[in-house]
A protein has these predicted regions:
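Residue-level detector of Asp-centered blade-edge/turn motifs that repeat once per structural unit
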Residues: 72-73, 135-136
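Blade-loop segments of beta-propeller domains
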Residues: 1
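Hydrophobic beta-strand positions that form the internal "hydrophobic ladder"
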Residues: 5-6, 77, 140
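Short loop/turn segments that connect beta-strands within beta-propeller blades
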Residues: 49-53, 112-116, 158-162
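A flexible loop/linker signature enriched in serine peptidases of the S9 family
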Residues: 8-44, 59-65, 80-107, 120-127, ...
Length: 172
């Protein structure tokens, strides 16, 4: 039996090759840029067999779906997503914030390992990402960036999203 591999990818983005060509041209031009990350709205979470066969898109929603991690028993997947920015009408103020920083609506979600039953766990006006389950599956730990995005703190909550609390205070 083969092990499944979970990953996030934009390979189904119809503009992926054009974006790649643009990035290559920038690098070849000698232009130096500060590090940046693109929360591409075409990121989705996939599973496949270890040899790449049986590729399945689990999240298949408009928005950045990435940073996935399995529960210890393999039945759940935690992930970060800004799908709310694409699935509802934003106010003018929200639209301006999102255009300035596409991580503005980044919250944590959980879904079954087959991609069903997606549930939003956090609702924060800042970036929530990098979620992991505790070994017994009762808690989730993640990072939450401050509003300017310059530092992050470690947070924890119950596996159902209740009892959120900050564990560190280094950057605040």
């Amino acid at each position: 039996t083969q092990d499944l591999v979970m990953f996030s990818s934009t390979h189904e983005d119809p503009n992926a090759l054009a974006k790649q060509a643009e990035e290559i041209a920038i690098r070849e031009s000698g232009i130096e840029r500060a590090y940046g990350w693109d929360y591409d709205r075409n990121y989705d979470i996939y599973v496949a067999n270890g040899d790449g066969s049986n590729l399945i898109n689990l999240s298949n929603a408009d928005g950045y779906d990435a940073e996935g991690s399995y529960s210890a028993d393999g039945t759940k997947i935690l992930f970060a997503s800004n799908r709310q920015a694409y699935s509802r009408t934003l106010s003018q103020a929200e639209q301006a914030l999102f255009e300035d920083d596409s991580s503005y609506f980044m919250d944590l979600y959980v879904m079954n390992a087959d991609g069903s039953d997606v549930t939003q766990l956090t609702r924060s006006p800042v970036y929530d990402g990098g979620p992991f389950y505790s070994p017994d599956g009762s808690k989730i730990t993640w990072r939450r960036f401050n509003p300017d995005g310059n530092s992050a703190e470690i947070w924890t909550m119950d596996a159902d999203g209740r009892n959120q609390r900050q564990l560190t205070a280094a950057g605040m």
